[in-house]
Amino acid sequence: KLTTGTVNINAQNNEEGTANQNDGTRYTLLSNPYTTYIDVSAFLTTNSADLHSDNGAIYVWDGSSMVAKNSGSGYKVPPAEGFMIGTVGPDGTTRQIDFTTSMMAIDGTDNAISGQMMDENKAIIILKAQQEQTQSYADIYFIEEMTNGFDFLYDSEVFGSWGDNLIYSRLVDNDDGLDLAIQSLPYSEMWEKTVSLGVNAYSGEELVISIKEQTTPADLNIYL
């Protein structure tokens, strides 16, 4: 239901087991209740205490897979668009998720990254893995003030079971086995950075990995 005021929604975590199990039951389906776009960064910051520590993102369906969008993405959620979030456990815990008018954005022009000039001291590489009709993405962001370890709201786990994601990255420092859909790293270290990638491929089928989008400096060489 579209509205113009503050909206509070209860979201329940039904996940059992360890934090890294990620069996999909920590997620809740929400939608933008406003007739305007909402800024993802503002939404995540407002609700950060109620989000699962591994996620810190929303997950949207792009027609073929669930795609993570976090505070580094510059994403704006269109009116009435649905998305998933992962909330804090343990099993059976209910958290209140808030939508406020301060999250409203004028438009969604930042949704399209390719071909645009990005903010100074920010660069993006989006890797795409495709096998038959299945595809998924691993985003690498270079942003000032990020670290090589885990940065909540800027580093985000893949959605659901690891086997559903063809490609992911691992933390440069302090890798604890978390498969990341988005990893944010220091901009100033971009020219000398090595990032570990992982793939899950179906046997007997060709897997194609490519750079879907990038806004990196012209003098940066990328090797896959």
Residue ranges and their predicted role:
Residues L2-Y223:
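Compositionally biased Ser/Thr/Gly- and acidic/asparagine-rich
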